[in-house]
């Protein structure tokens, strides 16, 4: 396993985001595995071989999303970050991005210059362009491009230059403007204005169609994410559940991988854009017994849903975990199994302490975030 030892940004002290980039991948994985095993040790029954080998992908060129701060001036824009020393650093050559994405990021710097859009200055509360957000679909190499602006003032300039950009890069399928008028370092605002007829980007993992809209969460490492979803599919299939819940379902990645035409699936996600994407996928797959609803997962589990208990429950919460209340609800529902996908092993361990009547039978680490402290964990809990 290789590592990104030649990252110039890191060597020059301009970007420290990949804090472990100087360590061999094997050493990075060993540290992550040790942390996971220590956190989950209280829940491990030595009678069962819970920890499976970690799943890894490429150490460079794997990331499908760029969040670039707009810096510099209208005549000399910089897309990247502010370095620890306060320098505006272009990150267009970041090695986490595929080569075609790097090239497009450079082109977007020229686009901003040609359009004459002044980057927003937080210290002076002046300027227009705050961020550029670029998302890449691996299935066709297509892109969604978002401009985060302070106001509507620069939209006409973007529209003026956009035809030339899209003629040069026909793989750009979705373009939008997000309005973020607040004088704070907030990534995006409430209002999204589409500049293209298309409003979603298509992705495909393991023959499952998935869709990305501007505000819907999507995994940033598609290579390893596809393996994560496939593993979930295989683990769930072992139980042949007659009904499924997918809580914190996002665009439906887990549930749609585990669904079948004769199995009722209920997916719950608070973000309405993600639910719209999940419904579209289910329709394409011909899944008539699937329902996706934009609700809070904890509230859903406490409501009328408690009358129809599923045989298997999938949870994929944000970093805060599912919380004590939902843990108690899951314990009361008593499904055959609970499949927990976590991006924070600390809150996973905390939640496991609140789920009663289950044993941990499988745990697998998925390294979606090389060179960082973060990783994804898939944990299978089986009813005692």
Curated annotation (Swiss-Prot):
PROSITE patterns: SAM_MT_RNA_M5U, TRMA_1, TRMA_2. Signal peptide: none annotated. GO terms for biological process: rRNA base methylation. The keyword Secreted does not apply. Keywords: 4Fe-4S, Iron, Iron-sulfur, Metal-binding, Methyltransferase, rRNA processing, S-adenosyl-L-methionine, Transferase. Coiled coil: none annotated. GO terms for molecular function: 4 iron, 4 sulfur cluster binding; iron ion binding; rRNA (uridine-C5-)-methyltransferase activity. InterPro entries: 23SrRNA_MeTrfase_RlmC (IPR011825), MeTrfase_TrmA_AS (IPR030390), MeTrfase_TrmA_CS (IPR030391), SAM-dependent_MTases_sf (IPR029063), U5_MeTrfase_fam (IPR010280). It catalyses: uridine(747) in 23S rRNA + S-adenosyl-L-methionine = 5-methyluridine(747) in 23S rRNA + S-adenosyl-L-homocysteine + H(+). Belongs to the class I-like SAM-binding methyltransferase superfamily. RNA M5U methyltransferase family. RlmC subfamily. Catalyzes the formation of 5-methyl-uridine at position 747 (m5U747) in 23S rRNA. NCBIfam families: meth_trns_rumB (TIGR02085). This is 23S rRNA (uracil(747)-C(5))-methyltransferase RlmC. It comes from Shewanella sp. (strain MR-4). The gene is rlmC.
């Amino acid at each position: 396993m290789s590592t990104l030892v030649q990252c110039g940004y890191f060597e020059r002290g301009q970007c420290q985001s990949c804090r472990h980039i100087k360590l061999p991948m094997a050493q990075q994985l060993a540290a992550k595995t040790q942390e996971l095993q220590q956190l989950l040790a209280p829940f491990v029954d030595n009678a069962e071989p819970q920890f499976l080998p970690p799943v890894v992908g490429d150490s460079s060129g794997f990331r499908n999303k760029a969040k670039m701060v707009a810096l510099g001036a209208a005549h000399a824009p910089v897309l990247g970050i502010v370095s620890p020393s306060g320098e505006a650093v272009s990150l267009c050559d970041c090695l986490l991005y595929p080569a075609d994405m790097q090239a497009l990021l450079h082109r977007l710097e020229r686009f901003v210059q040609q359009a004459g859009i002044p980057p927003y200055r937080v210290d002076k509360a002046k300027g227009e362009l705050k961020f550029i957000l670029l998302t890449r679909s691996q299935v066709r190499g297509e892109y969604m491009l978002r401009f985060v602006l302070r106001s509507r003032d620069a939209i006409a300039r973007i529209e003026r230059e956009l035809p030339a950009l899209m003629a040069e890069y026909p793989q750009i399928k979705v373009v939008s403007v997000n309005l973020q008028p607040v004088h704070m370092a907030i990534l995006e605002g409430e209002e999204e204005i589409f500049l293209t007829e298309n409003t979603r980007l298509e992705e495909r993992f393991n023959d499952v169609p998935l869709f990305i809209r501007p505000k819907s969460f999507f995994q940033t490492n598609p290579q390893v994410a596809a393996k994560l979803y496939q593993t979930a599919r295989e683990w769930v299939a072992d139980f042949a559940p007659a009904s499924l819940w997918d809580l914190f379902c996002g665009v439906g990645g887990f549930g749609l991988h585990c669904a079948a035409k004769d199995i009722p699936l209920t997916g719950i996600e608070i973000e309405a854009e993600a639910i719209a994407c999940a419904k579209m996928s289910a329709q394409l797959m011909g899944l008539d017994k699937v329902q996706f609803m934009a609700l809070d997962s904890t509230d859903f589990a406490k409501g009328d849903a408690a009358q129809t208990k599923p045989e298997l429950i999938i949870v994929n919460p944000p970093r805060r975990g599912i919380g004590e209340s939902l843990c108690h609800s899951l314990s009361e529902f008593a499904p055959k199994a609970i499949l927990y996908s976590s991006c924070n092993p600390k809150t996973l361990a905390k939640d496991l302490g609140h789920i009663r009547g289950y044993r941990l039978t499988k745990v697998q680490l998925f390294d979606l975030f090389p060179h960082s402290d973060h990783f994804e964990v898939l944990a299978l809990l089986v009813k005692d």
